[in-house]
A protein has these predicted regions:
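N-terminal secretory signal peptides and thylakoid transit peptides that target proteins
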Residues: 1-18
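Extended, low-polarity segments enriched in aliphatic/aromatic residues
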Residues: 27-271
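C-terminal segment of classical bacterial N-terminal signal peptides
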Residues: 22-25
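Small side chains
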Residues: 18-20, 72
Length: 271
């Protein structure tokens, strides 16, 4: 009997670079059969969803990570939406591919996720994430139609929240003992870094951990943010924190200023 794709199964294409979860109790009770899964898939075509499905199965299945939970997916949309590297679209070059996003949303929804929230802090932009995607030729309604409850949030500022939330760094951190983040990083049970494998002039390579550098809002960690309080809107990138200048007196003043910001301390999740 032929299988007919519904609207919520609209995109039968994708591959995932990395996944992490913040629900450790259930993880400990049901250990995965593997901690890493690697598969070859030659295109963003119809083979990607079954390939992804097998990979998630090798990791113990999506259900134990997402069923009944709110999932935060940090996308990699670094670089201008209008940039065309080698004449390629953003998704075929420096952004995570839109079909990858759609396929992951579809599979997580099928596995029982209660809510899926797509997250990104796009450089110095305060526009809704839907609008930022539109500038690259993406239609955000495709992602929202791939699951029962899908939301998008620009995490460069407060977004739909009223406060930034403080996340402590284990063992004190190297630059900051804690970070102030958008509410979406607290209001999730499972966190996923959906990265794009590419080279990077500062880090050398971008993978799942480097993708999380974009979690920090440029309203607080931007290069030209005021010393005494967060900006209302982002104005610049985070270059000062990703270069040797991070050890400079100016960066030290920024760290002292950020430490003094009042925020709700995050106690409900770990990284």
């Amino acid at each position: 009997m032929p299988h007919v794709l519904s609207r919520r199964q609209f995109i039968a294409t994708s591959a995932v670079a990395g996944i992490g979860a913040t629900r450790f109790a259930s993880w400990a009770r049901s250990a995965p059969s593997a901690t890493v899964s690697i598969a070859k898939c030659g295109s963003y075509g119809a083979d990607l969803v079954p390939t992804l499905d097998r990979m998630f199965g090798q990791l113990g299945g999506l259900g134990r990570l997402v069923q009944g939970r709110t999932v935060g997916i940090k996308l990699n949309l670094t670089g201008s939406p209008q940039l065309r590297l080698g004449g390629h679209s953003a998704g075929a070059a420096h952004w995570v591919h839109p079909r990858m996003v759609g396929a992951v949303v579809h599979l997580m929804d099928r596995a029982g996720a209660r809510r899926i929230r797509l997250l990104e802090s796009p450089y110095a932009s305060a526009v809704p994430l839907e609008e930022y995607m539109f500038q690259a030729g993406w239609d955000a309604s495709d992602f929202m139609g791939a699951g029962a409850r899908v939301e998008l949030e620009n995490t460069n500022g407060l977004g739909r929240g009223r406060d930034y939330h403080r996340f402590d760094v284990p063992k004190g951190g190297l630059l900051f003992p804690s970070y102030l983040l958008n509410h979406s990083f607290l209001d999730c049970d499972t966190f996923v870094s959906l990265a794009k494998l590419k080279d990077h002039m500062t880090a050398g390579v971008t993978l799942s951990m480097k993708n999380c550098f974009g979690n920090i809002p440029t309203t607080i960690y931007g290069d030209y943010v005021k010393q005494d309080e967060p900006d209302l809107a982002p104005r610049s990138g985070r270059g000062l924190l990703s270069t040797p200048e991070a050890a400079s007196p100016r960066a030290s003043r920024r760290r002292s200023s950020i430490r003094s910001h009042r925020a709700t301390r995050a106690t409900g999740c770990r990284a």
